[in-house]
Amino acid sequence: MFRLDAVKSRIAATALVTGAALLLLSASAGAALIGIYRNPMETTAQRAQAVKLSGARCARGGLGKALRVVVGKRTKECAYRTPVLGRDLEIAATERLLSATPKPVQHGAFLAVNLRAGAGARYQLAVYPLQKKVQLRKTLADGSLEYLDIEKNVAGVKGLDMANQLRLRAFNLTEGEEKGDCRLLGFIGGKLVVEASDESAGELSGRASGFSVGSAKNAKGAQASFDDVVVRVPSPF
C-alpha cells in the first residue's frame, strides 16, 4: 500500500541530511577567521622573518617594498616559510613573476603558497602566470605528487610583473561523515577557483606555512616578488 506520509518523512530526512552536509561545507568556505600574522615585506627586518624551507640555491633580497627571490642553478623551487606553524591555517600573499625571469623559463614558472609543509611534503596552491592555470596539489615526503584540482584559462591570473593574490585554506572537518578530512580552498584575487577534500590528510605531518617560486622543469633564473603575507586561523567564537 502506498503511504504518502512515509514518503514525505523519507524526503524530509534526505533533505535534512543533504542540508547538513551543505551547511558543513559552506561553514568551511565561509568560516570566520582571525589574522594572527601579517608581513608587508617592506623592510629588511620584515623580509628577514621569511626563512628558507627548501631549495638548494636560492638568492633573496629587497625589491622596493617586497621580498625578491631568485632561483639558482640545479634548483626547481625556492620555498620560504613564515614564523607561523599550525594545522588549520589560511595563508594569503601577493606574488609577481618578474620579467627578469629568462624567457625560456617564463612559460613553465609558477608562484605558490604552501600549508602543512615539512619533510618535503605539503599542500600547495600553484599559479602559472603565463599559462593562466591554477593547480591545487599535494606533495608527499617521497616526492610523489597528487593533483587535487586544476583550473585552466583563469581570468584572475595575471602575467609578468603583475600582482597575483593567492590564498590557500586547509581546515580539517570536525563533524559529519567527512570528519577528519581536510577541506582545501584556493582563491585567486578573492575568487574561489579550486577546491578539494582530502581524506588522507594524516599523510602530512608538517605544520609550516609559506610561499615559493619554481618550475617543474628548468627554473634557473626564475624571479618573483612577495609581499602582503597574511596568516589566519579559524575563529573559536
Go through the PLM ranges and name each one.
Residues 70-140:
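Secretory/extracellular carbohydrate-interaction modules
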Residues 41, 93, 158-197:
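Carbohydrate-binding surfaces in secreted/extracellular proteins
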Residues 195-227:
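Flexible glycan-contacting loops in extracellular carbohydrate-active proteins
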Residues 140-167:
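Short, aromatic/His-centered strand-loop micro-motif at the edge of beta-sheets
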Residues 55-76:
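Short carbohydrate-recognition loop motifs
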Residues 41, 227-231:
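Extracellular beta-strand elements of beta-rich domains used
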Residues 14-25:
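Bacterial N-terminal signal peptides
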Residues 31-52:
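Extracellular carbohydrate-recognition regions
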